[in-house]
Amino acid sequence: MASSFITVPKPFLSFPIKTNAPTLPQQTLLGIRRNSFRINAVSTKWEPAKVVPQADRVLVRLEVLPEKSSGGVLLPKSAVKFERYLTGEVVSVGSEVGEVEPGKKVLFSDMSAYEVDFGTEDAKHCFCKESDLLAIVQ
């Protein structure tokens, strides 16, 4: 899990400065100093099964295809990515979804899907509308 460091400035603070100038009497002048503090923001991992889509949205776990074909030919990344985005397993559904249930395998268009990163290393997920699903695979 990677952490990010950002610096956020505090408001200006006044503090006394002593001077040793011979022409000025020993007095305290106000100086202005700018402080800052550091915030350590750590990204959290989400359990995909606990994420509930809203309305007619569906959460789909993208199917990962092997990088080699059955004949041993290495497939280019663009071909693997294109095919992978067309199939997946439904993880959870919104309250207005009618026919689709969790556990079903679906085909969908990658143009209407919104990919999200839950911090899990094993799979990628995306949200799409129920109307954007092309088919349910039996």
Swiss-Prot record:
It is found in: Plastid, Chloroplast. Gene3D superfamilies: GroES chaperonin. Pfam families: Cpn10. One of its GO terms (molecular function) is ATP binding. One of its GO terms (cellular component) is chloroplast. InterPro entries: Chaperonin_GroES, Chaperonin_GroES_sf, GroES-like_sf. Residues 1-61 form a transit peptide. It comes from the Eukaryota. Residues 50-137 are annotated as: Cpn-10 domain. Keywords: Chaperone, Chloroplast, Plastid, Transit peptide. Expressed at low levels in germinating seeds, seedlings, rosettes leaves, flowers and siliques. Belongs to the GroES chaperonin family. Functions as a co-chaperone for protein folding in chloroplasts. This is 10 kDa chaperonin 1, chloroplastic. It comes from Arabidopsis thaliana. The lineage of its organism: Eukaryota, Viridiplantae, Streptophyta, Embryophyta, Tracheophyta.
